[in-house]
Amino acid sequence: MALTKAEMSEYLFEKLGLSKRDAKELVELFFEEVRRALENGEQVKLSGFGNFDLRDKNQRPGRNPKTGEDIPITARRVVTFRPGQKLKSRVENATPKED
């Protein structure tokens, strides 16, 4: 199972007493700010959670898996995430819930 933005909004609604509309808007604004920062080439550091970084990948040779033909894979910018030590520790020590 995956955590969705809708579930995050519902959690904020229940825990903070926000209206459903405000909870949804808060989640959307958070992710929009992360997107905006990354689009502007900024690193996003969330203390106790992790860092979102941009990495430029160079063009490299690739292969079409169907035909075996050599093709170039174009240079591109990708988003990477590096979890912080607190998040790593909590995940390592967590017991997954059964569905």
From Swiss-Prot:
It comes from the Bacteria. It holds the Pfam family Bac_DNA_binding. Residues 49-71 are annotated as: Disordered. The keyword DNA-binding applies. One of its GO terms (cellular component) is cytosol. The keyword Mitochondrion does not apply. SUPFAM superfamilies: IHF-like DNA-binding proteins (SSF47729). This protein is one of the two subunits of integration host factor, a specific DNA-binding protein that functions in genetic recombination as well as in transcriptional and translational control. Belongs to the bacterial histone-like protein family. This is Integration host factor subunit alpha. It comes from Erwinia tasmaniensis (strain DSM 17950 / CFBP 7177 / CIP 109463 / NCPPB 4357 / Et1/99). The lineage of its organism: Bacteria, Pseudomonadati, Pseudomonadota, Gammaproteobacteria, Enterobacterales. The gene is ihfA.
